[in-house]
Amino acid sequence: MVLYIMKWDIHPDKADAYLKWTQSAVKRTAVPGVVEFRAYRPASGSSQIAVTYEFDDMAAWAAWQGKEDIQKVLNELHTLAINVTTELWGPSPVVPAPVRPKK
């Protein structure tokens, strides 16, 4: 699995526009090739956002990243958010598969 992490702060002057934009942005980025999408906010309720996308492999991530509509969404994000960062993580050679506790 490949994990793509994005973090940002909602621009303080654009909170309403950001909330409206997210309704379409999530649908436009959660497309075939994405195994899972999740979004997080700090428990403190601040304007920070973290999202994760999981892909089967680097090729799936690269295909997703190369799509014109994905690039459009990312460009739009930069007009509504500040401090945007991204991280791309590949599988660990030490723990290549998930470890799930028994129930």
Indicate residue ranges for each PLM-predicted region.
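Short, flexible segments with low predicted structural confidence
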Residues: 1-2, 16, 32-34
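Short, well-ordered beta-strand segments in beta-rich or mixed alpha/beta enzyme
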Residues: 2-9, 38-67, 103
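Glycine-rich beta-strand-turn "strand-cap" elements at beta-sheet edges
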Residues: 35-50, 73-103
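Residue-level signal for secondary-structure boundary sites
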Residues: 14-16, 59-61, 94
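Short, surface-exposed ligand-recognition loops at beta-strand->loop->(often short) alpha-helix junctions
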Residues: 9-20
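An amphipathic, aromatic/His-enriched active-site/gating alpha helix that lines ligand/cofactor pockets
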Residues: 20, 24-36, 54-88
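Intrinsically disordered, low-complexity segments enriched in polar/charged residues with Gly/Pro
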Residues: 14-15, 25-27, 39-41
